[in-house]
Structure formats: C-alpha cells, structure tokens
Regions:
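Short acidic/polar inter-strand loop motif in beta-rich domains
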Residues: 335-337, 352-360
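A beta-strand/beta-hairpin structural motif
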Residues: 309-336, 364
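Short beta-strand segments of immunoglobulin-like
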Residues: 264-271
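Beta-strand-rich binding/interaction modules
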Residues: 275-283, 287-302
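Surface-facing alpha-helical segments and adjacent helix-coil boundary elements at the starts of domains
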Residues: 1-247, 271-277, 288-291
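Proline/serine/threonine-rich low-complexity linkers at boundaries of modular beta-sandwich domains
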Residues: 246-260
Length: 367
C-alpha cells in the first residue's frame, strides 16, 4: 500500500517510537516497536489504530502521566509531527475519556489544539465530542479566536456532521444548530482553508437540514465581505445539484423561460467500462437575460433493480433573449473504487435551474 506507506509507514512508526522513548527512557515500548514492523498489510486507519493501541499498552499509567510523556516528546528535538501524530492524538482522547474527570477532558482538548498544527486532530476530537458535547463546545468556540489558523480550522472541521474518515457524533446529528456559533464566528476568517472548512461544514448540514443552511447563508449574504459569495457557492453545492429553489435563488438562478432539446444520446447500449456521449440544446425563450445552472443527472442501476440519480455539473451561463446554447458531454462507466456499476437500464436527464427534463433511457451491458 504505497499511499499508506508514504504517510504512516515503518519510518514514521520508528520515529514515533524514538520520540516517545526519549520522553520516557524507562518505558520498554515493546508493543510499539513490534507494531512498527507489521504495518505493511494494513490500511492507513488500521495503522493508526494499531499504533494508538500500542501506545496505550506501553504507557499504561493515568492520564496525567500519559499526557506528560506526550508533552515531553513534543518539546524534544526528535521528529514529532506529520502522520505519526494521528495515533498520538487519538490515544490522548481515549485516555482523557477513560479518566472520567472534567480536568482530564479539558486538558485533552487543550492537547489536541496544541498538537493540531503538527497534524490535524480532527479525527481524535470526535471521541471527546461524542463523550460530552456540551462540555466540549464552549472550548471549541474559544478556538475560533485563536491566532493559529490550524486551531481555528479544527473548530469547524472537527465538528463537521459528516467528516470523512471520522466517527459520527450523535449529539451533533441530533442538534444541527449546535455548531452554528462556530460557523458564524469563522465564515469571515482571513484564512481560505478555514473558510473552505466552514463551507464544507454547511454542505454537510444541508444533507439533512436544507432550511437551516439556506437561512444561514441568507444572513451572511445580507452583509457580505469579499469572500462570502465564494464561500456560499461552495456551501450550497449539494443543494444546487438537488435543485433546491431557495439555494438557487440565493446564487441568482431563478425560474427560467427556456426550451430544452435533448439529451440526444450517441448510443442506446453501452459496453461495461465504456462511455456514452450526449448533446443538449437550450434556448432562452424569455424577454430578459437569464442566468442558468445547467447540470445532468445520471440515474444508475442499483443491485435491487431501482435507479438512483447522481448530478454532474455541465456549465453556468447567462443567455440573452432568443440565444441558443449547444452542449456536448461524454460520461464514462470506467470502473472506479467509489462506485459499483450494475448492468441494465440507466437514464439520463438534463437539469436547468433545478428543473429536470428530457429523461432518456439506455442500457449498460454486462461485463
């Protein structure tokens, strides 16, 4: 696994062992040393989990003792940054939760903020959020005033409802407004990476709470700065693809007087792993220039025989009255790791400002 080897391979694991040994000379670290040599068949997360468990096994003392060792390692001269920090931060979170005290919880939060510039602690913090969201959120909100952009990003990225690779936090899913104060504090942040995290956080929320998201972005757009428009466009991307009328209107896409010709397909049957091409014509039949968000929806066959749609961007354009636009696109059915294709009837339709039309069926052949 070259990708995992590059990020958290044997050299990184040995570097972690060396840094911990320097901080705790009397610790044997036999479990950690052994773990460093058996990473090869494991995924990145499995490697992190193995090294986390090895740290916990080799440093079995209480939370204060464990935290002291990590702080000493962080102050040391040996390398102590990059992906080797992932198992460290998750071990801190495990220890803080297991201690069962407010002091350990608060100190664990502080340590994650201190370490996140070395490697984001967005995955580790989920354990603490899941354990006690009410106690964690005031601390997280305080991070929004940090002078360190990595800490400010941790405040919004670490609390995302659907953070990739991370465990879910039921209390955040149950109360979508719980993290809004963090977003309100950071949507004007000077750092683009922090603002992008705010947008991704809102996009997560839009999956289950579109009305909350469009209300939030409407408030921001009422008093924008030079970056608000871009942030909102990124935050609303899923709602735009779904044709949400309020989201479309916020970005200037209103009900349009247009005619749509097509999509016209270049084949009625597509070999497995092949491509299908299509063309579509759009004409503004109104009397005013019209701004259009033009997408296409590919309805894929599922294993149970039903169809499920996925929206793909075509273009954004403004058409003058009477103006025509011709578009062509090729869609690939090449095998990818994130989607399994099933042979059978598929369908394609064009979506203009959230309104779908021209649904046309074709067949994906078996391998």
């Amino acid at each position: 696994m070259p990708f995992a080897d590059e990020l958290l391979g044997v050299p990184a694991a040995r570097a972690l062992t060396a840094a911990i040994q320097a901080a705790a000379p009397d610790a044997s670290l036999t479990t950690l040393r052994a773990a460093a040599e058996v990473l090869s068949p494991l995924t990145l997360r499995e490697r992190s989990d193995l090294l986390r468990d090895a740290l916990l096994a080799d440093l079995p003392g209480d939370y204060d003792s464990f935290a002291g060792t990590i702080r000493t390692a962080a102050r040391g001269t040996l390398p102590f940054s990059g992906w080797l920090i992932w198992p460290v931060t998750t071990a801190i979170a495990v220890k803080a939760v297991a201690a069962g005290t407010d002091d350990a919880f608060d100190d664990g939060m502080r340590m994650l903020a201190d370490l996140t510039p070395r490697l984001t602690a967005e995955f580790a913090i989920r354990l603490l959020l899941a354990h006690n969201l009410d106690r964690a959120m005031p601390i997280v909100l305080g991070w929004t005033a940090s002078t360190d952009a990595d800490v400010r990003r941790l405040a919004t990225e670490g609390t995302r409802p659907f953070l990739p690779w991370a465990i879910r936090v039921p209390a955040i899913l149950a109360d979508p407004a719980a993290t809004l104060p963090v977003l309100h504090a950071l949507y004007r942040d000077e750092d683009e990476v922090v603002r992008r995290s705010v947008a991704n956080h809102l996009n997560d929320l839009s999956r289950q709470h579109p009305e909350l998201v469009v209300a939030t972005t409407a408030a921001w757009l009422a008093d924008p700065d030079e970056n608000t428009g871009r942030l909102v466009r990124h935050a609303l991307r899923t709602l735009i693809k779904k044709g949400n009328p309020e989201a479309l209107a916020q970005l200037g896409f209103h009900p349009a007087e247009v005619t749509v010709a097509g999509p016209a397909l270049d084949a009625q049957a597509v070999p497995f792993g092949g491509t299908i091409g299509f063309t579509v014509g759009i004409r503004n039949t109104g009397t005013e220039p019209t701004r259009l968000a033009i997408d296409y929806v590919m309805h894929h066959q599922k294993a149970n025989g039903t169809l499920t749609g996925k929206t793909f961007k075509l273009t954004t354009v403004t058409l003058a009255p009477g103006e025509d636009l011709q578009l062509s696109r090729t869609h690939s059915f090449r095998a990818i790791t994130t989607r399994r294709y099933h042979p059978g009837v598929h369908a394609l339709e064009v979506q203009v400002n959230g309104v779908a039309s021209g649904r046309t069926e074709f067949t994906l052949l078996a391998e």
